[in-house]
Amino acid sequence: MKPARTDWDSYYARPYRTASLTRKYTASVLVDLLRNHGGVGAAILEFGGANSCFIEQILDEIAPARYDIVDNNQLGLDLLKCRYPRDQRVSVIRGDVLSMHEPERLYDIVFSVGLIEHFDPAGTARAVAAHFSYLRPGGTAIITFPTPTWLYRAVRGLAEATNNWIFHDERPLRLAEFESAIANLGRVESARILWPLILTQYCVVVRKFP
């Protein structure tokens, strides 16, 4: 019987085979968006960023005032702490996006990459809402999630058929579901499909309502 959930310990211990290729592209997209939405000198929060594969490029090219990471996987968080033991800008927090506490601070930018699709529809809506709970009025949310294009379906189907698919609880989303989740939270500023990822993802930028 196939596992019902993704084994994140195994993922962080041994990343998916194509990860290094797709991460470079995603990082370049994120850096451009952060630069264009006030990321320089900003307070940034990454949800689901255990052992973040984007933090190095963002710290180097965007130079935020602070970069906080929230995730519930201890192994991934420990790996990240080892990478940045003395950088005062970086804070690592163990937490669950579905049960976050009242925020101690609000951020200029909150983002996640490939997080909200790992829940049922109600959980996805809650995960999306958490981004905005930690975002200041007028701040920017950047959220990516897989979407079931013909290319995504073909590649995932092949991976599943050959027992190489590891994201067992991944639920590719259509843009309409995401738009419904943010309808009362903010305004979509841009939405595009990142085709070079092969396992295609939407990248959506949302401005929180004032």
Regions found by a protein language model. Give the residues of each.
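A conserved beta-strand element that flanks and buttresses the S-adenosyl-L-methionine
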Residues: F111
